Amino acid sequence: MLVPTRVKHRKQHRGRMHGKATRGNTITFGEYGLVALEPAWITNRQIEAARIAMTRYIKRGGKVWIKIFPDKPITAKPAETRMGSGKGSPEYWVAVVKPGRVMFELAGVPEEIAKEALRLAMHKLPVKCKIVRREELEGGDANEN
């Protein structure tokens, strides 16, 4: 599973997700991509589940790129703990995803197989997504809905 090896600060503020993705909104490696249409936190387990779903479907052919990395720690306090006494310990890691962000890329397989693999990955993620081809993103703005 994806987790940072070292972090400068063990705990982070929650933060807010404003606007669209300005970085990571183009297909750089593959031919097909999975683009987020709404903001969300995507956990390292969800990323791994989507990756496994794609790689199992495309079998030995093709290549998958994961374009998001869970670098934000989410803390939680134990169950039945009284309020106060500080912030909880880090429980899991999330990737902050804004609309327009390309999360996964795929290449080296026919179009039908690529679309089905990305569709399977889409069902593992907590956001609405769309499947795009490299030409579609280069032609116009990917953030336009």
UniProtKB/Swiss-Prot annotation:
<dbReference type="GO" id="GO:0022625">
    <property type="term" value="C:cytosolic large ribosomal subunit"/>
</dbReference>
<comment type="similarity">
    <text>Belongs to the universal ribosomal protein uL16 family.</text>
</comment>
<feature type="compositionally biased region" description="Basic residues">
    <location>
        <begin position="1"/>
        <end position="21"/>
    </location>
</feature>
<protein>
    <recommendedName>
        <fullName>Large ribosomal subunit protein uL16</fullName>
    </recommendedName>
</protein>
<dbReference type="InterPro" id="IPR036920">
    <property type="entry name" value="Ribosomal_uL16_sf"/>
</dbReference>
<comment type="function">
    <text>Binds 23S rRNA and is also seen to make contacts with the A and possibly P site tRNAs.</text>
</comment>
<dbReference type="GO" id="GO:0006412">
    <property type="term" value="P:translation"/>
</dbReference>
<comment type="subunit">
    <text>Part of the 50S ribosomal subunit.</text>
</comment>
<keyword id="KW-0820">tRNA-binding</keyword>
<keyword id="KW-0699">rRNA-binding</keyword>
<dbReference type="Pfam" id="PF00252">
    <property type="entry name" value="Ribosomal_L16"/>
</dbReference>
<dbReference type="InterPro" id="IPR020798">
    <property type="entry name" value="Ribosomal_uL16_CS"/>
</dbReference>
<dbReference type="InterPro" id="IPR000114">
    <property type="entry name" value="Ribosomal_uL16_bact-type"/>
</dbReference>
<keyword id="KW-0694">RNA-binding</keyword>
<dbReference type="InterPro" id="IPR016180">
    <property type="entry name" value="Ribosomal_uL16_dom"/>
</dbReference>
<dbReference type="GO" id="GO:0000049">
    <property type="term" value="F:tRNA binding"/>
</dbReference>
<dbReference type="InterPro" id="IPR047873">
    <property type="entry name" value="Ribosomal_uL16"/>
</dbReference>
<keyword id="KW-0689">Ribosomal protein</keyword>
<keyword id="KW-0687">Ribonucleoprotein</keyword>
<dbReference type="GO" id="GO:0003735">
    <property type="term" value="F:structural constituent of ribosome"/>
</dbReference>
<dbReference type="GO" id="GO:0019843">
    <property type="term" value="F:rRNA binding"/>
</dbReference>
<feature type="region of interest" description="Disordered">
    <location>
        <begin position="1"/>
        <end position="22"/>
    </location>
</feature>
